[in-house]
Amino acid sequence: MNRKNIAKGKLVRRFGINIFEQPKYDKLLKKKPNPPGMHGRSRRAKITEYGKQLIEKQKVKFTYGISERQLTNIFKEARRQHGVTGDNLLALLERRIDNVVYRAGFAISRAHARQIVSHGIIMLNGRRVTIPSITLRANDIIQVKEKDSLKKLVRSNIEKTSTLRKLPTWIEVNADDLNVKITRPPSRDEIPTLANEQMIVEYYSKRA
């Protein structure tokens, strides 16, 4: 196991949840349910409210593979929008182009999806893009660049992930033409619960 996998494994154990949504980490949590450095029935130290908020924020950062600055900016945008700030925050994260590539099964992980976008393999509304943080809107269409080797790679990824991941209802995936259409923004109940978004809102609200 390489250093990157070890680091991810430690994060999963620290948070007690499979934030990377990959089967091998479910197995790890079953085998080692305690956080790194804690063995047996040792009691966790009492966590402050701030500590709890920080943990939830970190879950989201590592889940989506974004920086502190990126998450801060996404929170500010979520707060400007109408509706519930926490719901808006998660919807914005889900509509990142790298996340949609991941959700569609075009990539085996979000890190892989970021790489695919960064390398210019994905087209957005007919134009090549290389920025993983682009936020997609309703009726946007992404597709794989016209190159046989790239299409072969993506089709292989779709096959690998088809039994592991359920396609979101707010996107339409054409596996034959390798394109994805955003039909609408996701609602809160369509987004997997990996963190308590209200605690994240409270964390940033105190620092605004």
Swiss-Prot record:
A Pfam short name: S4
Described purpose of this protein according to its UniProt entry: One of the primary rRNA binding proteins, it binds directly to 16S rRNA where it nucleates assembly of the body of the 30S subunit.
Domain S4 RNA-binding, chain residue ranges per copy: 95-157
Lineage: Bacteria, Pseudomonadati, Spirochaetota, Spirochaetia, Spirochaetales
PANTHER family attached to this UniProt entry: 30S 40S RIBOSOMAL PROTEIN (PTHR11831), SMALL RIBOSOMAL SUBUNIT PROTEIN US4M (PTHR11831:SF4)
Superkingdom assignment: Bacteria
Name recorded for this polypeptide: Small ribosomal subunit protein uS4
Record note on quaternary structure: Part of the 30S ribosomal subunit. Contacts protein S5. The interaction surface between S4 and S5 is involved in control of translational fidelity.
Keyword presence, RNA-binding: yes
Species this chain originates from: Borrelia hermsii (strain HS1 / DAH)
Family: Belongs to the universal ribosomal protein uS4 family.
Keywords: Ribonucleoprotein, Ribosomal protein, RNA-binding, rRNA-binding
